[in-house]
């Protein structure tokens, strides 16, 4: 059985295969990794073939679908390991990344790993979970890798929020999966990036995000997490709890005022 399943959604076949080569070359034990690349294809021969396998490399060919979400969830159905990682065209791991990931958690439990992606200097949202890495147990509980109501934008925001809400995140910022994102000048802007970055897509993603929070948060959870927030002494953990509560619509003044009272007590 493989220890890690990489699932890689893509509409850029050439770049995806080059990226896959780097992931496997940088792994300490590539033979323990299955790499599933899920392609948007316009080639009728590929579409008829549907799937190609060679050792631990799997390629799946499907008709075009916008964004990464649909392809991620379809690829995950083929994953066999207890640790599932979403690879992307513009994400490159560090040397021996696989060993570090495996040693970072009990992958038989329900867990989400939060690593570094090199954008922290520009992205000040310290709550964001970088690179989607989760256990099979977590995947099975959710029923998806990225919520299927999303197309692309904001899917990582909801992954972050629900992972923190459920308190399954393990912080390992010493592990790097570098995100070569065009917005910080690490790669060139292409048509896919432009299509995924329109105001319309952001508005759609935000609406889905807000609706899903409403569906996944109730007064009981608010009361439980609010008490946890008041009792928490670790500044970072308190910040994360504040993020979860504020995103769910809890009044900021309530957090500040009650936190001050709690500190006095």
Predicted regions and their residues:
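Short beta-strand-to-loop acidic/aromatic patch adjacent to the donor-nucleotide binding site
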Residues: 81-92
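Aromatic-glycine-rich donor-binding/catalytic loop that engages nucleotide-sugar donors
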Residues: 136-153, 161-172
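C-terminal catalytic/acceptor-binding lobe
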Residues: 157-265
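Glycine-rich, basic loop-to-helix element that forms the pyrophosphate-binding segment
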Residues: 62-79
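Short, acidic, metal-binding catalytic loop of nucleotide-sugar glycosyltransferases
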Residues: 21-32
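Short beta-strand/loop segment that forms part of the nucleotide-sugar
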Residues: 31-43, 61-62
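Conserved donor-nucleotide/metal-binding helix-loop-beta segment in metal-dependent transferases, i.e.
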Residues: 96-112
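Short beta-strand-to-loop element that shapes/binds the nucleotide-sugar donor at the catalytic cleft/hinge
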Residues: 111-130
């Amino acid at each position: 059985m493989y220890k890690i399943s990489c699932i890689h959604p893509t509409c850029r076949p050439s770049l995806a295969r080059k990226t896959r080569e780097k992931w496997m070359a940088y792994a300490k034990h590539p033979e323990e990794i299955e790499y599933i690349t899920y392609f948007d294809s316009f080639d009728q021969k590929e579409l008829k073939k549907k799937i190609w396998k060679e050792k631990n490399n799997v390629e799946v060919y499907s008709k075009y679908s916008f964004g990464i979400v649909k392809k991620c969830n379809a690829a995950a159905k083929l994953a066999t390991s207890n640790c599932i990682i979403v690879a992307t065209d513009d994400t490159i791991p560090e040397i021996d990344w696989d060993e570090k990931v495996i040693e970072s958690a009990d992958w038989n439990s329900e867990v989400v790993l939060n690593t570094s992606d090199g954008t922290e200097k520009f992205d000040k949202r310290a709550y964001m979970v970088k690179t989607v890495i989760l256990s099979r147990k977590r995947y099975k509980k959710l029923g998806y890798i990225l919520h299927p109501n999303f197309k692309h934008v904001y899917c990582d925001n909801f992954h972050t929020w629900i992972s923190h809400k459920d308190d399954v995140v393990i912080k390992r910022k010493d592990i790097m999966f570098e995100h070569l994102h065009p917005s910080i000048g690490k790669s060139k802007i292409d048509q896919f990036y432009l299509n995924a970055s329109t105001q319309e897509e952001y508005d759609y993603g935000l609406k889905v995000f807000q609706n899903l929070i409403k569906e996944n948060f109730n007064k009981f959870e608010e009361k439980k997490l609010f008490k946890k927030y008041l009792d928490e002494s670790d500044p970072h953990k308190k910040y994360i709890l504040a993020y979860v509560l504020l995103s769910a619509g809890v009044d900021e003044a309530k957090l500040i005022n009650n936190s001050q009272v709690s500190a006095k007590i």
